[in-house]
Amino acid sequence: SQTSNFLNLGYWFSKDFRVDWENSLHHIENASQLFSSRDYVLNNFETKPKATYKFTEAVQAELSSALRQKKRMDGEEFLKTFDLTGSLQWERRKTSVRGSFSFINNDFSGNNFSIVGNQMLDGLKPGKNQVWSVFLQQSINSFIQLNMSYEGRNSGDRTIHIGSMQVKASF
């Protein structure tokens, strides 16, 4: 089970510049009938200020930072994360391209190889991580759309690349 509380604030300083501040609290309880290693209780907190600037009708940029804290209430795992992310988006007629890059520093104590540790770290590793992505969406005609995405991450020792392509037809 999960309970969540959110407080989000936003303000347009001009027609081109917006600031948002997203805050959340989550209480997560997971219970498995087969594996006791999948039983856990987590309290998570996140605060994330974000600035968005629209350069033109087609181009906008975002810069955000996030502070996350995740605590296992029935165990020893504890995570404090600082995330700095920048993104750029371009849209024109039937084409949209979005790219982002994040520096993520995970200060983690506990077993990061456990199910709970992996869930708390969102698949990343303790310490410094870099994550990036590029997404392209192209409408071929009124009922066919092409989506291509590329994601990468580096946690120090090895870089991982993931790509996908999808053709979607709506009838």
How should each PLM-predicted stretch be described?
Residues 1-171:
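Exposed, low-structure sequence patches enriched in small/polar residues
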